Curated annotation (Swiss-Prot):
Protein name according to UniProt: Tachykinin-3
Gene Ontology biological process terms from the UniProt entry: neuropeptide signaling pathway; positive regulation of blood pressure; tachykinin receptor signaling pathway
Propeptide, chain numbering: 21-79, 95-116
GO cellular component: extracellular region
Subcellular location: Secreted
Signal peptide range: 1-20
Pfam families: Neurokinin_B
Underlying gene: Tac3
Keywords from the UniProt entry: Amidation, Cleavage on pair of basic residues, Neuropeptide, Secreted, Signal
Residues bearing PTM Methionine amide: M91
């Protein structure tokens, strides 16, 4: 679900950027200067990548999406354990050893008669 939303956001931004470039209004020199100063605040490796690739490549987009989809899978196991602990807490008991039968003495077990 998270990766689908990320993909939709990246797709929407890339389409807006593509159509925005075609419909862009002429700007004054002052506006252009402030845009460049905003770019100088970015880290150098990101700037290098931005200037090296003028267009968005499909391979780069797929790499970013695959890296983003790896993150939620790593956290799914602890979440499952937390839910298990929650439901066990609702039941009021928890076995420290799984599937260990308790010693049951038949004399202490109530009987409702003999089934025929």
């Amino acid at each position: 679900m998270r990766s689908a939303m990320l993909f939709a956001a990246v797709l929407a931004l890339s389409l807006a950027w593509t159509f925005g470039a075609a419909c862009e209004e002429p700007q004054e020199q002052g506006g252009r200067l402030s845009k460049d100063s905003d770019l100088s605040l970015l880290p150098p490796p990101l700037l290098r990548r931005l200037y090296d690739s003028r267009s968005i490549s499909l391979e780069g987009l797929l790499k970013v999406l695959s890296k983003a989809s790896v993150g939620p899978k790593e956290t799914s196991l602890p979440q499952k354990r937390d839910m298990h602990d929650f439901f066990v807490g609702l039941m009021g008991k928890r076995n420290s050893q799984p599937d260990t039968p308790a010693d049951v003495v038949e004399e202490n077990t109530p009987s409702f008669g003999v089934l025929k």
